[in-house]
Amino acid sequence: MVLVRVVANLLILQLSYAQKVSELVVGGDECNINEHRSLVAIFNSTGFFCSGILLNQEWVLTASHCDSTNFQMKIGVHSKKTLNQDEQTRNPKEKIFCPNKKNDDALDKDLMLVRLDSPVSDSEHIAPLSLPSSPPSVGSVCRIMGWGSITPIQKTNPDVPHCANINLLDDAVCRAAYPELPAEYRTLCAGVPEGGIDTCNGDSGGPLICNGQFQGIVFYGAHPCGQAPKPGLYTKVIDYNTWIESVIAGNTAATCPP
């Protein structure tokens, strides 16, 4: 689930091993139209390439490797072909990255806060998702969702988002699966031991929701997607709560944890 596929050109230059930058949910089913009200679809000139999460009426959180020139965000989307009446489109007014992010490491502190050019309104298909209030426990049931590829090798992007349940695993499982990643990365490890269910190309920036709380952002994984014993890695949102809250409050110079 090497999430680094979303920004393929950029990441290929920096991370020859990163293959899952923008992955889709493999092994899932079509999401209920009302279960992804905070899910944001991100498009550029080539089409859909990443997801994000609506935190409030003005801010979206996604992966920093989802940054692209002239992208747009669509909120309230289910089918990419059929417009919802309450669907809203916004452009980025401001993009904020961790100021202490390592410039030579595209995967370090892989978060991007995007301020919308105008606020969105809550509606039948639009509602923000709060930051987590407590960290998740190993064994927690977690929900993944996105418009990413639904096939593990050949990229097959669906018209509607797919959802699936996976479990939060011990960090040691992912450390063993991905020894190339620095130990200081603040991540969560999630998947199913037998494989077959995973985020995949195009799912980057989307959420990992554990027991109803927004705990992770799709970050990194194996290619092909869904292979055992290589679960997905997700940026650990709660470790960045203070930074996110500070930026939203107006302190755009706030520093992320090391």
Swiss-Prot record:
GO terms for cellular component: extracellular region; secretory granule. It is found in: Secreted. Inhibited by benzamidine, PMSF, leupeptin, SDS and DTT, but not by EDTA, and commercial antivenom. Expressed by the venom gland. CDD domains: Tryp_SPc. It is an enzyme of class 3 (hydrolase). Monomer. It comes from Bothrops jararaca. SUPFAM superfamilies: Trypsin-like serine proteases. One of its GO terms (molecular function) is serine-type endopeptidase activity. Its EC number is 3.4.21.-. Belongs to the peptidase S1 family. Snake venom subfamily. One of its GO terms (biological process) is proteolysis. N-glycosylated. Contains approximately 10% carbohydrates. This is Snake venom serine protease HS114. The keyword Disulfide bond applies. Residues 1-18 form the signal peptide. PANTHER family: KALLIKREIN-1 (PTHR24271:SF47), KALLIKREIN-RELATED (PTHR24271). Keywords: Disulfide bond, Fibrinogenolytic toxin, Fibrinolytic toxin, Glycoprotein, Hemostasis impairing toxin, Hydrolase, Protease, Secreted, Serine protease, Signal, Toxin, Zymogen. Residues 25-249 form the Peptidase S1 domain. InterPro entries: Peptidase_S1_PA (IPR009003), Peptidase_S1_PA_chymotrypsin (IPR043504), Peptidase_S1A (IPR001314), Trypsin_dom (IPR001254), TRYPSIN_HIS (IPR018114), TRYPSIN_SER (IPR033116). Its main location: secreted. It holds the Pfam family Trypsin.
